[in-house]
From Swiss-Prot:
Pfam families: Ribosomal_L9_C, Ribosomal_L9_N. PANTHER family: 50S RIBOSOMAL PROTEIN L9. This is Large ribosomal subunit protein bL9. The gene is rplI. One of its GO terms (molecular function) is structural constituent of ribosome. NCBIfam families: L9 (TIGR00158).
Amino acid sequence: MEIILLNKVANLGGLGDNVTVKSGYARNFLFPQGQAVPATKANVEKFEARRAELEAKIAEQLAAAEARAAKVAELAEVTIASPAGDEGKLFGSVGTRDIALAITAAGVEIAKSEVKLPTGTLRETGEFEIDLQLHSEVTATIKLVIIQEA
């Protein structure tokens, strides 16, 4: 099925690209999320008329993500206090939700889906480098310190 992408889609293309995808992927995922439209003659003409508006919107989202990345870079570190045993093993774990809440409390709005933990939840005290995927093109790193709760 021929479609026109309305924004950047991983492993497919960018704004305005005419691509061929399986019809189920288009109907069940891309169309409902507003990421694509069928490549009919009428839709191609409509898209060309709105291209500048869509490009400006994408540039605005990218600029906002870069501004948030700069704010994250200004934060030296974020500290989370969690109950732990004598050897530094946590009673429970620190996950993406906890990290997002701690960064938001420090002054930078972060969603839990933007926090990337490739090794899973953190289960011990110490210092960790946490990657944040703020936009498809913008990533940031923040230092997270987990301390034993008094």
